[in-house]
Amino acid sequence: MKKIGLTGLLAMLFATPAFSSETYTFDPEYTIPAFEVGHLGFTTQRGRFDKTEGKVTLDFAAKKGNVEFTVFTKSLDMGSKAWTVHVSSEGLFNVEKFPTMGYKSDRLIFEGNKVVAAEGQFTLLGVTKPLKVTVNHFACGPNPINRKFMCTGDITATIKRSEYGMTKYIPTVSDDITINVPVESYRD
């Protein structure tokens, strides 16, 4: 058996590729959470939140990471002032009492080098519940315009708003809300 000296051991340690996690920050110009809800049994109404903050941490070698984001509910936009005021009110998003909602993953689910889902905790109206979200169109690479390295994906989930205490107008306004968060994030 051959002996390896301290110098040889150090050389092996430093020659081993080091894999570490990387953090990406949401681009607020392109990460605009939106939702859909059935209205009066006839139409699907859509709204969006114009202010959000978030980070994604990815370790591809270990197939680990997390995503965490905060949505500022006062940035709600329903497409018209009156409709926005109504949906912002007590009994619905109640933005004065609950100025934020958010998601924090407990774990990311990978297929190869692609994130396909996350399991975590969603908070709405001060109520936090487990929520598994789907991640579609996950990709990482240089932005073709500014050349900065980015990771992107579309986060989707459906919740029952009544489980978070938002019961006003059920069933006239559906209990199910579909959430869509197109995420564009740049490496820190």
Label each residue range with its predicted role.
Residues 15-17:
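N-terminal signal peptide c-region/cleavage motif recognized by signal peptidases
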Residues 20-188:
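Low-complexity, acidic/polar, glycine-enriched regions of mature
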Residues 1-6:
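Bacterial N-terminal signal peptides that target proteins for export
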Residues 11-12:
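Repetitive helical segments and hydrophobic/amphipathic motifs
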